[in-house]
Amino acid sequence: MSKLDLNALNELPKVDRVLALAETNAQLETLTAEERVAWALENLPGEYVLSSSFGIQAAVSLHLVNQIRPDIPVILTDTGYLFPETYQFIDELTDKLKLNLKVYRAGESPAWQEARYGKLWEQGVEGIEKYNEINKVEPMNRALKELKAQTWFAGLRREQSGSRAHLPVLAIQRGVFKVLPIIDWDNRTVYQYLQKHGLKYHPLWDQGYLSVGDTHTTRKWEPGMAEEETRFFGLKRECGLHEG
């Protein structure tokens, strides 16, 4: 696999970009997660960043990428509405893995947003999308720009939802390369990795949560529910960071 020209690929229509990356993706599918990270660091341009929501399985990608690229900036978009257990988990993992954590937030505080717009998450899909744009998308775009990112690692997996079922290992999103090293991992592989490296699931895993985001748009899993139904009242799966 040869080095890829980000500027040249960004000039192509989206469909042509996908086709241009198809051969590389076919080869990346045959590699291990660790090999994918190593390949990206050797063949894709820096600066490099890793994003994390510090969700249920976050320790996996944080450990995997950070051990190969120590001190890689780890981007967290903090809405101000995360669970107390999530903030504690962030502190625990940051200390344990010696993460180079970079926290980005909306320009308006949660209280100010509620004063201006009301509780956006109670205003249907349109309200949720506006909430995500303010609290997730804009801060992430700012992070990528300020950190001069050209290659972005994330811990998405196909098994998590229908919207992620066909994602490739390598794509271009928001004008940068996006690498998903554990995209093809199943729950068993995640569990085995955590066990092997002495890592933990998010604290709310033991309370029945399969996916964790903000307190007001996250539900415990109940029999018969798909994982994606535990977020955003089942109206949508993605918070906007991994769309587009």
Curated annotation (Swiss-Prot):
Keywords: Cytoplasm, Oxidoreductase
EC number(s) given by UniProt: 1.8.4.8
Chief location bin: cytoplasm
Gene Ontology cellular component terms for the protein in this record: cytoplasm
GO biological process terms, semicolon-separated: hydrogen sulfide biosynthetic process; sulfate assimilation, phosphoadenylyl sulfate reduction by phosphoadenylyl-sulfate reductase (thioredoxin)
InterPro entries membership: PAPS/APS_Rdtase (IPR004511), PAPS_reduct_dom (IPR002500), PAPS_reductase_CysH (IPR011800), Rossmann-like_a/b/a_fold (IPR014729)
Cited function: Catalyzes the formation of sulfite from phosphoadenosine 5'-phosphosulfate (PAPS) using thioredoxin as an electron donor.
Pfam families from the UniProt entry: PAPS_reduct
UniProt-recorded name of the protein: Phosphoadenosine 5'-phosphosulfate reductase
Pathway: Sulfur metabolism; hydrogen sulfide biosynthesis; sulfite from sulfate: step 3/3
Compartmental location: Cytoplasm
Active site location: C239 (nucleophile)
Reaction equations catalysed: [thioredoxin]-disulfide + sulfite + adenosine 3',5'-bisphosphate + 2 H(+) = [thioredoxin]-dithiol + 3'-phosphoadenylyl sulfate
Similarity comment: Belongs to the PAPS reductase family. CysH subfamily.
Gene Ontology molecular function terms on file: phosphoadenylyl-sulfate reductase (thioredoxin) activity
